Structure formats: C-alpha cells, structure tokens
Amino acid sequence: MPYMPYPQDDAPYSGNDPRVASFIKKFRDAEYIFDHWKDKYEEAYEYTMPQRESFYEETIGERRTDKIFDETAVVGIQEFASRLQAGMVPTYGRWANFEAGSEIPDDAIPLVNEQLDAITEYVFEVLGGSNFNQEVHEAFMDLAIGTAVLLVEEGDSLNPINFQAIPLPRVMLNNGPDNKIDTIFRTRYINYNRLMAAYPKAEMSPEMLKKISDDGHAKAKVVEGVFKVYDKPNEEIYKYCVVCMDMQEMILEKELKGVGANPYIAFRWNKASGEVYGRGPVFNAMAAIKTTNLTVELILQNAQMSISGIYTFEDDGVINPENIVLQPGSLIPVAPNSRGLQALPAAGRFDVAQLILGDMRANIKKALYMETLGRPEGTPMSATEVAERMSDLSRQIGSSFGRLQSEFVTPLLRRVIRI
C-alpha cells in the first residue's frame, strides 16, 4: 500500500485571508509548470539516480534499482558531480577572490584589496568548516539532470552557516517578468508539535495550537515560499512566507532586504528560451542510457537461455513437462521412435550486442564529460593532445559555466558574505 501520510491534492482555499489566497494562487501556478516536467525528471532519476526520492508516491523501503541493468550512467553522474566540484569549487580550496572594482579610486585600491583579501580568507575558512562540500556535491548531481537548489541558512556560533541541497521533487520554481527565477516554493512535512522548533518566530492561531495539542504527532504539509518584490526597482527585496496547507494558515511572513537576502539559490546547467527548469547533460544522453540499459537486459536474458536452455518435445502423451526435473542423473521417459527433449538454439549474437554497447557507453561518457583524456587502456596521449582536449572541453561547457557563474557562484558568495 502506498505510504502517503498526507494528501497530495490540497483542498481549495476557503478562508478569508488574502495573503493565504495569493500564496496558494502562486503555488498553483508553479505547480502547473512543475507537472509538465515531472515525467521527464522522473525518467532521468530512474536511470541515473534510482535511490533518490521519487516525484510520485512510493512505499517505504521500495526497491528502485530493479530497472537498472547497466551502471554506466549511475557511475557517470557521480563522477560528473565530483569533477564539477573539483573544477569549480574545490574542497578546502580558495576558488574565488574579492577585488576592488572600477568605482574605487586608484589610490585606494591597494588598501581596499588588502581588506578584501582578509574577508576572502575568512569566507573560505567558514566554508571549509561547514557542510558546504557535502551538500554541493548532492546539488551538482541534481544539476546533471538540469536544475539544483541549495539552501543557505544562518547557523550558530559553532556552525555559522548551514547548507542544504533541497531534493528537486520538493521544489517548485517560476520565472519573473525578466525571465529569471523569482519564485521558489519548498514543500516540507513536519510533525505539528515540531513546527515551533522549525520556525521559532511563527505565529500560531488558536485552531493551530489546538491541533498541536490534540494531534501533535500528525504530519503537517508546510510550504515555504520566497517571492521577489518589484515595488522598488533599485532595491533587492524578497518576501518569505510559510503556510500550513492542511490548516490553510500562514504561520510566518517576513521581508528580506538587501543583496544576498534570498536563502535559496536555484541554478541550472542549461535551458531552452522561456523555460523555467533546466536541461542537464543527462537529458542529452537519455536515448543512449535507455538503449544501453535495454541491450544489457536482453543480453542477460539471452545468457540465461543459453545456460538453462529452452527445450521442445513431441506431444505424444508420454512426456509430462510438469514432472520433468533437469538435473544430473534425471531419467526422462520418452515414447518409442520419439526424439525426446530437443534444445532450442538461442537467438541473437552476443558479439553484435557488445558492439552496440561499446558505442552507447562511449556516448554516455561523452555526454557526461568523462572521456576528456581518452580511454585509459589506449595509447597514452601527448601533452599537446591533452592540452587540445582540455581546450575543447572548455569550449563545450563554456556557456554552462557562464550560467553557473551568474546563477550559483555569485549568489552563493553574496549570501555567505551577508550572513
């Protein structure tokens, strides 16, 4: 039986709070867009990250690896995330510098750069001591599919900053008038008696407090929303709201002002014009991934037929297939002048299938940028060829890195500096 402790379809809003009505309207708009991407992302997750949370209902402990017969994409997406992390935000490395801009007078630049260098050193000291490296790897795995979301929150004196990679099934996005992401929803399921721990500044109505008292261990569907406010063009302002969808009540609302105020960082590998969600390298390789998976499945079926065999027999009334046991020492009765059991030759050729697999696996690795230095079993490349291959890789991913610079690196550093 599906494990669903909460309803998926929320009841229409029946209250008289215009804030909640506006919130739910925006949530439904984002949900409508999200529904068009569910099937595409779910298919990609099934073939590349089967252990991740599904976009649809599932049972507790459900096996999701039964469809995987070839692990090239599963391993490849892990390597893609690791290579991207090592190349863009290396662990314990200082992968960015703060320097004075053109608006600073020339005579003040050395002093400003000296101060900014100290700030840079402290920022990366905090990043190195936080959980950034663990969480950004999870986010980069989602990025291989197309879209990733990283939550950057203020911590305590021991851990000044907390990072959390939000699973894509829990996130809904929408574009603003400038065709940039300006609306982010995150769905959470929290026990009623833990709402105050999750949101210490929440304001609870008497009905909510009664629900917490009477049924505190029940799951509450909570949606966090962050919207950009365009009332003041020269200021960066966001509205942060938390709504309990089951009770249809807004328990928290506050305004976030300034650069780096938005705690959610949504970034994409690539996207088509006008679309909200991104398309990652896995999308380009899905045809090869599915073909490879199916080919290996057919090879295994053919191998099973070759090992155990398929047999034919003459229906002469003597042989009873229900009583035949194929094992050493078995005695099988046959009619006079009968051929008895005859092995059926296996169809298909393993060598042809291996040729297909070799090409498909190479395409998958190329799509995930795993073949930049060639195959290890081949002839070692010269330094010139290595340099040329790396130059070609830079041209291939240049546009994607430019997008990551504007959607991930810059907002991340602004958020960290603000905290």
Role assignments for model-derived ranges:
Residues 1-212, 216:
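Extended, helix-rich architectural segments
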Residues 8-12, 96-113, 121-129, 266-289, ...:
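Charged, low-complexity surface segments at secondary-structure and domain boundaries
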Residues 10-16, 20-22, 153-326:
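Structured, contiguous alpha/beta core segments that scaffold functional sites
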Residues 32, 299, 340-343:
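Acidic/proline-rich low-complexity IDRs
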Residues 73, 78-96, 105-113, 257-267, ...:
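Long amphipathic alpha-helical segments
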Residues 114-117, 121-132, 141-145, 149-152, ...:
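A broad, structural surface signal
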